[in-house]
Amino acid sequence: MQRLFDRLTGGRGYAPYPFQEKVADTILKGKNLFLCAPTGSGKTWAALLPFLSARQTGQLLADRLIYVLPLRALATSLYKETIKACSNVFKVKLQPEDRTREKDEIVITIQTGEQKNDPFFEGDIIFTTVDQCLSSYLNMPVSLPGRVGNINGGALLGSLVVLDEFHLLDPDRSMKTAMEMLSRLRPFANFIIMTATLAAKSMDMMQEILGGEIIRLSDEEVLALPSHSEKRRAYRWIDKPICTDDIVRSHNHGRTIVIVNTVDRAQQLYLTLRQEFRKKDKGAEVLLLHSRFYPADRKKTEDVLMDWFGKDARNTNAVLITTQVIEAGMDISADNLHTELAPLNSIIQRAGRCARYAGARGTGTVWIYELEQDENGRSRLGPYRDQSEVINDTRKALAKLNPAGEILGFYAELDLIDRVHTEQESAYLARYDQDLFSLKQKILAAMDGRNQTAVRELIRDVASVNVIISDQPEMLRFDREKWPQMLPVPRSSLYKLKSYLSGGIIDDTRVAAIPDETGDESDLRFTWSWPTDIDQLVKASWLVVIHPDYAGYSAELGLQLGVPGASREPGYFQRPLIPRYTIRYETYGEHVRRVMDAAREMQGFNRCASEKLAACYDLDSGRIEKLVEIACALHDVGKLSVKWQNGIREWQEYKDPAKLTHEPLAHSDYDPEKDWREKQPSRGNHAVESGYAVSQWLFDNLDNEMVAAVIYTAIARHHGAFSKSLSDFQLIDDAATWAGLENPPFIQGKISLLDRPQPTDRLEFADDYLLNFERDEEWWPLYAFIVRRLRLADQKSQKGDARYED
């Protein structure tokens, strides 16, 4: 372990701290863990080290590590640091499709609303956000079209899930949902919950609910940390809102960070401070960073930041105006940190960006200012509008500090946090058991597609939606090889457009459009509607396209809503959110064989999940893999319908008739760059029909009817997370023969198939036969695993790991 740590940290003779070794030992023993340690102490390496050690030694600890963070900026920062460190030991790849299975290879990815590099959580180490993780658990992943919503939940099984900065979760929404998720996953995954500022009583209560061990650093361990041994960080309460004069006066050509609670406030303050420093200190570098920059523009600022505020920075005389995006984990430090009032645990997190390093940079001042007031004399709470009591308690606690500044060490900070947060956190946690039935009902309804407001109810009310600025949404192409760049914004920020929407259309200009999805993933198309009501806009599933008369963007200020901007061609990612490739002619038998081969190739990346599922359902792990193979072998039986075969053969006649044989087809030639405008012959649906066709055979040949239901539900939903509508269809005469040709050897005999369902059969299959998780809750883990394996195998099944779905 020590040698691995030394190599990860550049071979400079560093050894892990005792608490990091204790964390690693606990996790390697298969236990769950709560870790309380100060900012800058090395919590991240405490979580990563056991996973990397297991990978290096071949120990089966977890199939992947999912590192979950409350903020996108923090995910990006840790992602970059981990790549740099792991490159000293491993062969690092950054995309799942670049995997070569070499020895010591590790795939490190990031999936946030801003950086969508791993939409299906296929990396070995995945950095993501709370929104992404919890919404994936709910089968409603933010930033992804709803049709692919049931792929990511299965990635949680067999994983080591790290929830960092846990105290920053909304205690009445995301924290409760995360606890329910971890409770459900306990037989199937391991977890680490990490925090610097969660009240001690709250952590004890969570341990009672979830089990696991608690590791807290002693006073001696904290003082032994280089970043804390000589730290002198003073806190000062200022009973008035932030003003530019105070910032300029205390700056003194040093390093200053200003943190405010909203992007709008940051943009306004940046413009004012930039002007002020131009008058009084032309040499000062004034920077702006928040969540509404395109990745390239944001990266430029973050790179510049390290030169001024990073650990090895030599430059001084810089001012950064920012928001909560740097509240946790970003490795920068200032001499003076000015912040608007926020909940105390957030204040302490922000303070972690002041006097962060040893030596001369271990001294600094945190200035905390009163909030601005609205025209009615009420505090502008911004994102903390639901936490007014905590804000008031924080205000009272800070007002008792020495007006000249009071130096607080780690345990003095924790004592202050206990006084402010214990009562509310304890009340929320005490209600967890009382609210659990209602919470589960909402979660299970979301998993079934029956709770469209689940993200707002169960994660956070300001959950993000993607925004594009364009006056012609119909010209945006989502079915090409590029996917348009988007900016995630809190849904609440869309209320800036309310006055424009009240009349519906103003001066014949449409304000904002939302998409309605049609087609499968391989041919995803949108029709556009223009809401005239703000509630419609705020409830948009994942994307809003705003007319440039009502939104603007610049590399200096980022996205501004309610401010006109010039119309510009939307930027495109170099690879689409859901990759689409040219589809090749493929017979039914060839396709089934390739899907099964792809599933077998993924088996090694799912060993831990298979073993844990087998233990839970009293099966052997080999049986779990056989269930995956059965799903893959039978998933496209619905394509053996008369309508499907007539339609696909007609299209192939148009593309290249010389390829046609007597065999039924699974795919025809299709080039998304050339053929997307062409109207193809109707083939009807096939996914739910496939599930129905094989359902009776599964009942007859598996010894558990619920396992049969898991498989045919996964088949029915291998193109849509909530598909349930069964159409009338008739199979070709020799469908059973073709369906049995490529089956794995353990499937003996002829496959009997159903078709031509009566209207009552169609209703009964949708309502009674397909899994309903409110009724069939205990089978969600097995379903989530099998449907994920099936859909990913279906994507990867063409030569060269070309991805497609049809």
Spans of model-derived segments:
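Conserved strand-helix element at the start of the C-terminal RecA-like helicase core
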Residues: 64-78, 250-274, 288
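C-terminal helicase lobe and adjacent C-terminal extensions/tails of nucleic-acid helicase motors
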Residues: 268-271, 275, 279-284, 288-303, ...
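Divalent metal-dependent catalytic cores for phosphoryl transfer on phosphate-bearing substrates
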Residues: 385-401, 616-806
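SF2 helicase catalytic motif II
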Residues: 133-186
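Interdomain hinge/linker at the junction between the two RecA-like core domains of SF2 helicases
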Residues: 198-252
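Conserved Walker A/P-loop ATP-binding site and its immediately adjacent core
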Residues: 44-45, 61-86, 198-202, 263
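Inter-Walker segment of RecA-like/P-loop motor cores
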Residues: 86-142
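Conserved pre-motif I regulatory segment
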Residues: 1-36
